[in-house]
Design a protein with these regions (language model features):
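Charged/polar positions within long, soluble alpha-helices
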Residues: 41, 45, 66-70, 91-94, ...
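Glycine-rich cofactor/substrate-binding loops
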Residues: 1-35, 278-490
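A helix-coil-helix interface module used to build multimeric assemblies
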Residues: 1-187, 197, 205-207, 270-274, ...
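Conserved hydrophobic residue
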Residues: 48-49, 262-263, 399
Length: 490
């Protein structure tokens, strides 16, 4: 109001529009402050703002910088988060200094700069949390590399395997997500500051200097693309939907394993919840939390993709993303932290898992393999023969022995075969079958231990990178504030 408009926003617009934008303030506050400080410094260094007014502007910005995000007086009636900061700045240093904060940039620029800074750090934190989960699974799996278990498909007993091999089934997708977030984080290394409206500015603003002040190694070259690019954020949300799906699969499988019918795993009490009505129950509440996040992450991606269908340079895009991205980053980190804690804290009942493997005929495929390798039957025929043996056992009971298999071969294929008793005994032993896997990545104990070491090493590498990235960002932020204090004479 006071320029192009003759009236302020309606109550309805404040509630539906500015309320949403102001709500993004706390999550973006620190990065918005860094954006404002860098812009003021660039204006002063470029000669666009004299030292006296520049120092006054910086003093006011440093005062705002010292306010904790949730202590700042965000007011939707004032407008978005930048307008709230601008009002507070004006109250502290007056319009003669505060009025220069928007020289050479629209108010959307500090949001774009802030969102990139928040996203880059959040991706590092999410990568670290996911790597902690994969590391926890590898730690659980290694001592159980040779412990017998039954693998399941369609919730039906399938083949003999080991507990360690089953646990690693969850570790690799989670680790890939951690490594994916590390790669995607590189898309936010370019600075979008100093581009003016959308085609540059006549103000003496050095974009490369702004990038340096903000800790970016390069600039996003095209001015309009820099200001409005949304595809990197879609990749972030896609990555979270993928990572959440992997964690949801872990949670769903684990809930089945925790059931009384399976009894393979027991969650730690700290990740469980009692029933308000039935005192005997120990509910795996943490797993429900994880699955809920997966649904939210998928919905977030869908909402963003739908919103981005509007044309280029539309306010819709970041009206959504300014709030959605920080929330998604926080949810990804804390959900992965919970999943890592669940993985590290769960107790595995190896005796029950072995019992399941020995009670179910999980060696059927191995017996078929043995027949094809030691008799005249081809594999497909051997498969049919063993299928007939299983059906006969289900209908009539009894043990599976050489005579029964030979009779089935004659009935199914008209073949006369002699089944080696020693070969059959070995093929019927699930532990022997699980160990007899020569391929890379199999359930062979040495292969499982090697995979555990690989997951542990890659997880540690991601965590080390994340810690270095977070530390580098903090160092850059402190250097920026030190420069601001120097120019402000503080």
């Amino acid at each position: 109001m006071g320029g192009r408009l003759t009236a302020g926003p309606s109550d309805e617009l404040v509630r539906a529009g500015y309320g949403t934008e102001a709500a993004a303030g706390p999550a973006l506050a620190d990065a918005l402050s860094r954006s404002d400080l860098a812009h003021a410094i660039a204006l002063i260094e470029g000669g666009g703002l004299d030292a006296e007014r520049g120092s006054e502007l910086l003093r006011g910005l440093l005062e705002l910088d010292a306010i904790a995000p949730h202590d700042f007086p965000w007011d939707p009636a004032v407008g978005d988060a930048f307008q709230n900061r601008e009002k507070e700045l004006t109250a502290r240093v007056g319009s003669s200094a505060a009025g220069w904060l928007s020289a050479g940039r629209p108010r959307r620029e500090p949001f774009r700069v802030a969102l990139r800074l928040v996203t880059a750090e959040g991706l590092a934190r999410s990568a670290a949390a996911f790597s902690d989960m994969s590391a926890a699974l590898a730690t659980q799996a290694k001592p159980l590399a040779g412990s017998l278990a039954a693998d399941y498909t369609y919730l039906q007993p399938a083949q003999p395997t080991t507990v360690g091999h089953l646990l690693l089934t969850w570790a690799f997708p989670v680790l890939r997500s951690a490594e994916r977030y590390r790669r995607v984080q590189g898309d936010f290394a370019g600075s979008v500051a100093g581009v003016g409206g959308s085609a540059g500015s006549r103000w003496p603003i050095n974009r490369e200097r702004l990038a340096d002040l903000l800790g970016h190694p390069r600039v996003e070259v095209h001015a309009k693309d820099a200001m409005w690019q949304s595809d990197p954020y879609l990749e972030v949300l896609s990555g979270f939907a993928i990572g959440a799906t992997s964690i949801s699969q872990f949670a769903q499988d684990l809930e089945i394993w925790c059931s009384q019918e399976f009894g393979w795993v027991e969650l730690d009490d700290t990740h469980s919840r009692v029933s308000a009505l039935m005192p005997q129950k120990k509910n795996p509440y943490a797993l429900a939390v994880l699955r809920t996040w997966a649904g939210q992450a998928t919905g977030d991606l869908t909402a963003a993709l739908t919103t981005m269908h509007t044309g280029a340079a539309r306010t819709d895009h970041f009206h959504l993303l300014n709030g959605l991205i920080p929330r998604s980053l926080a949810e990804a980190e804390r959900s992965a932290q919970l999943a890592a804690a669940v993985a590290a804290g769960m107790a595995i009942n190896t005796a029950r898992m072995e019992q399941s493997a020995r009670e179910a005929f999980v060696t059927a495929a191995d017996v078929a393999d043995m027949l094809a390798q030691t008799t005249s039957l081809d594999y497909r025929t051997a498969h049919h023969v063993i299928g007939r043996v299983v059906r006969d056992q289900v209908e009539h009971g009894g043990e599976i022995d050489a005579a029964r298999i030979a009779a089935a071969a004659n009935e199914v294929a008209g073949a006369e075969i002699v089944v080696d008793e020693a070969e059959l005994a070995a093929a019927l032993d699930p532990a022997a079958c699980a160990a007899l896997r020569p391929q890379t990545g199999s359930s062979d104990a040495d292969q499982v231990r090697a995979m555990c070491d690989d997951v542990a090493a890659r997880s540690a590498e991601v965590r080390c990178w994340a810690e270095e990235a977070i530390a580098a960002d903090a160092k850059s932020a402190e250097a920026l504030r030190a420069k601001a204090r120097e120019l402000a004479g503080a």
